[in-house]
Swiss-Prot record:
GO biological process, any: translation
Pfam family, one: Ribosomal_L2
Protein family according to the UniProt entry: Belongs to the universal ribosomal protein uL2 family.
Gene coding for it: RPL8C
GO terms of molecular function: mRNA binding; structural constituent of ribosome
Name this protein carries in UniProt: Large ribosomal subunit protein uL2x
Cited HAMAP family: Ribosomal_uL2_A
UniProt keyword annotations, A-Z: Ribonucleoprotein, Ribosomal protein
PANTHER family: LARGE RIBOSOMAL SUBUNIT PROTEIN UL2 (PTHR13691:SF16), RIBOSOMAL PROTEIN L2 (PTHR13691)
Source organism of the structure: Arabidopsis thaliana
């Protein structure tokens, strides 16, 4: 009898929790207050830092506390072009400069934005990954909503009071850079999840995987499996509608979708 395969072992035990003790903290806007609703607040970027497990760099921004004689430090997702010593302005009367935070109703149509709120005051939800940005499509003053285009291409309607940062998230093109060596991949996945290195099924013995064994590395049978296959057999192309290269009409439809 074969061994319990990798796909079966994944289902056992508790859900993996990523290592968060060395993270720098949650990246979000300031809490929405009177100053941002009616004017603007001025802050300064004190440093640009790397957050383990996150692709985009973070910016530590210091604001003057509105009520006490001290500084308020916030962590923002850094926009492309942001630098240490830069002055940031948050509020409805802030200028349209990369890194500033404004409500959507104060941002013109066609502007590139990032770290957009979903609900007023939730401190940023959409377009936060490295290189991501959203685009303001239109404003509807009748019901005070704005229509934005998300990085996925989907359109979304959100309240015009939701805040957004001008510009796109820094760190674009990060995934295009080759790993070059296994050590880089090791450090990448060490802070993310327990999924590396990943041995191919055809490189295993037949006792360890349905694709294993043979005098050369080959699957040896059709790689498609039925939907109700038992867990030890359910590897490969699960319940595939079709396999192989797209030809003819299917290829034309796929290119249209892209």
């Amino acid at each position: 009898m074969g061994r319990v395969i990798r796909a079966q072992r994944k289902g056992a035990g508790s859900v993996f929790k990523s290592h968060t003790h060395h993270r720098k903290g949650p990246a979000k806007f300031r809490s929405l207050d009177f100053g941002e609703r009616n004017g603007y607040l001025k802050g300064v970027v004190t440093e640009i830092i790397h957050d383990p497990g996150r692709g985009a760099p973070l910016a530590r921004v210091a604001f003057r506390h509105p009520f006490r004689f001290k500084k308020q430090k916030e962590l923002f997702v850094a926009a492309e072009g942001m630098y240490t010593g830069q002055f940031l302005y948050c509020g409805k009367k802030a200028t349209l400069v990369v890194g500033n935070v404004l409500p959507l109703r104060s941002i013109p149509e066609g502007a590139v934005i990032c770290n957009v709120e979903h609900h007023v005051g939730d401190r940023g939800v959409f377009a936060r990954a490295s290189g991501d940005y959203a685009i303001v499509i239109a404003h509807n003053p009748d019901n005070d909503t704005s229509r934005i285009k998300l990085p996925s291409g989907s359109k979304k309607i959100v309240p015009s009071g939701c805040r957004a940062m001008i510009g796109q998230v820094a760190g674009g093109g990060r995934t295009e850079k080759p790993m070059l060596k296994a050590g880089n991949a090791y450090h990448k996945y060490r802070v993310k999840r327990n999924c590396w290195p990943k041995v191919r099924g055809v490189a295993m013995n037949p006792v360890e995987h349905p694709h294993g064994g043979g005098n050369h590395q080959h699957i040896g049978h059709a790689s498609t499996v039925r939907r109700d296959a038992p867990p030890g057999k359910k590897v490969g192309l699960i319940a595939a509608r079709r396999t192989g290269r797209l030809r003819g009409q299917a290829a034309a439809l796929a290119s249209k979708a892209d």
